[in-house]
Amino acid sequence: MKTLTPRNWLIALLFVPIVALSQTVVLTGKTESKVTARVFNPNVLEVTDDNGGWFTNLEMQQLGGWDTPYEVQARLRVVSMNKTFQVRLDDPLTIRNQSNPAQVFRSPNVTLGNEGGEQKVLSVGRNTQFSNPEPPEDGVDTVGHYTLAISAYPPEGDFRSTVGAYSGVLSMTFEPVVKAP
């Protein structure tokens, strides 16, 4: 009679799972389930120019005399799932002379308002709310048109001392206002 060595035991153990896998398992009871899910559209807030893009440069003009501000306006299109959204400036608007950074425009003012409506002043750290018109039907995004207006007075000094190319960066945040359920 042969004795089983540890090697033979290992070989015998290798065949045990094969025997266990060959067993038939019978399932009884409920074998199907119905799963339902609700998919919600993500909250959309898209701000563009009229052509679906964005502005690369807005050129300010001084239409009055030397003591009048330089101004520019831009038309914005706001598409939103929610009717209400809020806007704030990320940083104060600073318009500097590219050759002489010490020369800056004074009292910059940034406003936004419904097209043809009252303009609201935008500022850093303060959210200002706006509302798009009602959508034409339920489940459709609202679309509103707004006028962005920027104005600032030229730097102190005469025309000869302040002449030059000026630039600045306008950084704003648009956020949807979410209602609690």
Regions found by a protein language model. Give the residues of each.
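Hydrophobic h-region of N-terminal signal peptides that target proteins for export
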Residues: 13-22
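A detector of low-complexity, intrinsically disordered, Ser/Thr/Gly/Pro/Ala-rich segments
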Residues: 1-3, 22-29, 122, 126
